[in-house]
Amino acid sequence: PLEVAEIKARFNMDKPVWVQYFFWLRGIFQGDFGWSGVSAAPVSEVFPNKLAATMELALSAGIVALFLGISLGTYAGARLNRLPDHITRIISVSGASLPNFWFGILLLIVFWANLGIAPIGRSDAMLFGSIAHPTGLYTVDALLAGNLKAFWDAIWHLILPAITLGFGATAIIARMMRSALVEELQQDYVDAARAKGLAERIVLKRHA
């Protein structure tokens, strides 16, 4: 009980909620973001160490969103009102409406619990134990160390989180790409290219 009371007093948890909020807000402006129970250290000390990994995940999600969004949008726009277009519309609506956390759980159920092909949790700590972390990016640090096993392990652990975070942006990019391509394919210069006898593949790549 004495230790509990001491901890409550240290973190102002023995005071009313509005007073706790005031202390928290004041701490934010002073650079004190609180205490991390997971890392057992101040958040201000943990944050810089985790920032690189967070940026790595965000960048990976952006790459996934761009690749899938542009690919799906182009494929659907070139096949207007056909099955690929309808499937892309469903994906776009799902991406715009499904919460990320729910979609992430769905991916875990399918690819980890049922199929067993996707890992969960952190990258294997044993692979990274002897690797220096000059950048803090697991994939980059593994490559710099010449440890391909660690590199692929990091990539493998990034796949599901990157898809989960990038799904919403994928839907938006796919819809924008589809709309832009459909509009371009209705232009006169595209009709002229088709009239010249160019293959649809060439029309899409060079003229649309």
Each model region followed by its residue ranges:
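An internal, D/E-rich "acidic patch" concept
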Residues: 13-70
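Hydrophobic alpha-helical segments of integral membrane proteins
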Residues: 3, 7, 17-33, 43, ...
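Alpha-helical transmembrane segments of integral membrane proteins
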Residues: 51-84, 113, 131-208
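Hydrophobic alpha-helical transmembrane segments of membrane transport/permease proteins
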Residues: 1-22, 111-150
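Alpha-helical transmembrane segments and their helix-entry boundary regions
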Residues: 16, 85, 101, 117-120, ...
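Cytoplasmic-entry segments and transmembrane alpha-helices of multi-pass inner-membrane transporters
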Residues: 71-107
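Hydrophobic alpha-helical transmembrane segments
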Residues: 2-12, 103-113, 160-162, 205-208
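Short, hydrophobic secondary-structure boundary micro-motifs
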Residues: 19, 34-37, 103-104, 119-121, ...
